[in-house]
């Protein structure tokens, strides 16, 4: 999403920031922190379909972060105003060009009333109970970063939004308005090959898909709401989203590869809390993803509505060892109509998709070494995605991470198996200041 579309908001925030900083006493000046990092990711099963062979990540990155609490103006101090700015400068050797990412976050937050918090600007939005699984969290994600081995921080993309949180003893309410659409960053064949139904095979640079985003106008503003309350250590959430699919799951023109982001309403709920007797934390989340343009599966060019369910459990054990399990189901709601409207050559999806996940975490050396294995497995597609990693916090400033993204499966159109030609091992070295 081009930042120019929300130029007025960002300029206003920047103007307040500059005024606050310029007029602040030297002792109250905001402090700069962040990190510099170098990353390398080598392919271990290269299908030679992407634009570069042998690797899919080689980059140097610098992050700059400023947080400031202005108090020069009485009203800013009274409202506990916070100005936050975070940006990355990236030298992406895979793309052979430096990239100024612009602000990853740039917002102003304040509390005008004792029960109301406001945040306006570019910000990371997230909710839900899943571990790498998102049902009611319909905010944008960067799955390319996820697959090539960037830090988990880069999985979630910022949104240009206004957020209002209202709190009371009875419950709390989050209201979010997003006037500028931000899509998921999905594999497009340049860096990561993928299964393209237009070719009926795994493709790379030869893919010629084009994505059409909803234009920025009042009628296209996305609205999110979350009502939540904690009762006896159990958090109950209800969620609503009115917006668009963040991945291009609709065709405007199938012959020319013109895809778009159909309208979507999401209704969901979740609960999370401790498990009696057995110990640990359990969660349950469900959501109805109502595809507004599929006409009860009569439109074969648009994603059908689905009901989704997630059950999770995690527990810590002695010696800094933790286990997490999840079971995830996606059920198509109008499957008979969906099948009846398929054409010859169309790929028929399963009515029910199932996926299991496992997370194992063990800390060593006074918790300075963290070893993790995360596994996705689908008995429907019979594919596996392994995410092993080992991180070593050598000092307060230096951190080294080595890991991998390993994809296994025989079906080219499987959710994870389609990336088997992109399996990689990576290394990240970071210095924080």
Located regions from the model:
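Hydrophobic, lipid-facing positions within transmembrane beta-strands of outer-membrane proteins
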Residues: 58-64, 103-106, 158-162, 221-225, ...
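Transmembrane beta-strands of outer-membrane beta-barrel pores
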Residues: 38-44, 70, 87-93, 124-126, ...
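Outer-membrane beta-barrel "beta-signal"
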Residues: 406, 419-433
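Detector for outer-membrane/organellar transmembrane beta-barrel domains
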Residues: 77-79, 243, 274-296, 300-376
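Outer membrane beta-barrel
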Residues: 67-194, 232, 407-409
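Transmembrane beta-strand segments of Gram-negative outer membrane beta-barrel proteins
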Residues: 27-46, 77-85, 371
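Repeated loop/turn-to-beta-strand initiation elements of outer-membrane beta-barrel proteins
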Residues: 72-83, 116-118, 170-173, 233-236, ...
């Amino acid at each position: 999403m081009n930042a120019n579309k929300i130029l007025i908001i960002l300029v206003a925030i920047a103007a307040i920031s500059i005024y606050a900083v310029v007029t602040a006493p030297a002792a109250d000046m905001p402090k700069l922190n962040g990190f510099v990092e170098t990353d390398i990711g080598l392919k271990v099963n290269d299908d030679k379909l992407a634009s570069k062979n042998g690797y899919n990540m080689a980059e140097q990155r610098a992050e700059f972060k400023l947080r400031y609490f202005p108090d020069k103006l009485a009203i800013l101090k009274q409202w506990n105003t916070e100005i936050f700015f975070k940006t990355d400068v990236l030298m992406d050797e895979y793309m052979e060009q430096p990239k100024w990412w612009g602000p990853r976050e740039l917002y102003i937050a304040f509390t005008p009333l004792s029960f109301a918090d406001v945040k306006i600007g570019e910000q990371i939005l997230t909710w839900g109970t899943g571990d790498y699984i998102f049902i009611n969290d319909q905010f944008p994600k960067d799955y390319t970063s996820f697959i090539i081995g960037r830090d988990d921080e880069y999985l979630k993309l910022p949104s240009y939004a206004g957020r209002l949180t209202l709190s009371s003893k009875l419950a709390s309410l989050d209201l979010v308005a997003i006037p500028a659409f931000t899509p998921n960053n999905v594999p497009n064949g340049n860096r990561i090959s993928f299964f393209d139904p237009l070719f009926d095979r795994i493709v790379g640079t030869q893919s010629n898909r084009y994505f059409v985003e909803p234009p920025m106008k009042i009628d296209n503003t996305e609205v999110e709401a979350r009502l939540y309350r904690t009762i006896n250590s159990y958090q109950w959430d209800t969620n609503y989203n009115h917006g668009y699919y963040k991945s291009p799951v609709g065709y405007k023109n199938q012959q020319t590869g013109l895809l778009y982001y159909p309208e979507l309403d999401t209704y969901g709920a979740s609960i999370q809390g401790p498990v009696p007797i057995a110990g640990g934390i359990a969660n349950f989340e469900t959501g109805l993803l109502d595809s507004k343009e599929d006409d009860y599966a009569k439109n074969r060019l648009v994603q059908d509505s689905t009901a989704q369910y997630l059950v999770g459990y995690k527990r810590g054990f002695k010696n800094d060892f933790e286990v997490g399990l999840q079971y995830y189901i996606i059920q198509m709601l109008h499957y008979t109509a969906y099948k009846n409207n398929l054409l010859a050559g169309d790929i028929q999806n399963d009515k029910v998709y199932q996926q299991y996940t496992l997370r194992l975490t063990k800390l060593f050396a006074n918790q300075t070494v963290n070893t993790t294995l995360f596994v996705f497995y689908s008995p429907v597609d019979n594919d596996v995605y392994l995410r092993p990693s080992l991180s070593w916090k050598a000092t307060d400033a230096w951190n080294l991470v080595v890991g991998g993204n390993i994809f296994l499966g025989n079906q080219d159109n499987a959710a994870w198996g389609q990336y088997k030609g992109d399996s990689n091992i990576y290394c990240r070295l970071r210095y924080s200041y």
